[in-house]
Design a protein with these regions (language model features):
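Catalytic cores of DNA base-excision repair glycosylases
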Residues: 1-209, 215-222, 227-228
Length: 231
């Protein structure tokens, strides 16, 4: 996906799920032929097109302003030049725009431009906190450089996807399926949960989760990501 498409898609993904993000993105592309048309359109039309993503009254003007700001600075909406910049310089360029936080920038850099960046979404933030890969009180913003320092750059892509999968299928926000976790022995949080459930009897153990597998392997997965939090 071109970087400008990835940028708009990721802004739409903030505080929603993949399905609603995709519905809004496809609606926007169907309504307007180019990003220049989105940039110059009546804001109400843009807002109406992206309603499936939620927070349309905030996201619509935000997307248009980012598109205008990029045009003012670059003369076009082509972001391919970012691929030639050092990753930190490219990250700084993206995050100077209102509504483009570290996660949004990292997604554009990693998934569109092939840069070594590690996006931290809700799932990654939760899982890495539980297994001790980050300090408990570390903010999401602080987690980006911290986690990048822990993983070799060539593993960012696969690690990002696999931790998200773990968070969605097993290490869920409420009542995680710790008994199915492939790294349970490395997780004090999970071991404590298992001990509490064992003390409470069989009713404390959650039922089987469709799609969750005890044999989950940490391997490279199909190219898909994104998440449900902001920035």
């Amino acid at each position: 996906m071109p970087a400008i498409d990835e940028l708009v898609s990721t802004i739409l993904s903030q505080n929603t799920n993949d399905l609603n993000r995709d519905r809004a993105f496809n609606s926007l592309r169907a309504k307007f032929g180019t990003w220049e048309e989105v940039r110059d359109a009546d804001t109400a039309e843009v807002v109406n097109a992206i309603r499936p993503a939620g927070l349309a009254n905030q996201k619509g003007p935000r997307i248009q302003q980012v598109l205008r700001s990029i045009t003012e600075e670059r003369g076009s909406l082509d972001l391919a030049f970012l691929g030639e910049l050092p990753v930190e310089e490219a990250r700084a360029w993206l995050t100077k725009f209102n509504g483009v936080g570290p996660k949004t920038a990292a997604i554009v850099l990693c998934f569109s431009l092939g840069k070594p960046a590690f996006p931290v979404d809700t799932h990654i933030y939760r899982v890495t906190g539980r297994i001790g890969l980050r300090p408990e009180r570390m903010t999401v913003e602080q987690a980006h450089p911290h986690l990048e320092s822990l993983f070799p750059p060539e593993t960012y892509y696969a690690a990002h996807l696999n931790i998200i999968r773990l968070g969605r299928e097993i290490c869920t926000a409420r009542r995680p399926y710790c008994e199915k976790c492939p790294i349970i022995k490395l997780c004090d949080y999970g071991m404590n949960i298992m001990s509490l459930r064992a003390a409470g009897g069989s009713e404390a153990t959650p039922a089987s989760v469709p799609g969750a597998s005890a044999s989950l392997q940490m391997k490279k997965m199909p190219r898909r990501r994104k998440n449900s939090d902001s920035s």
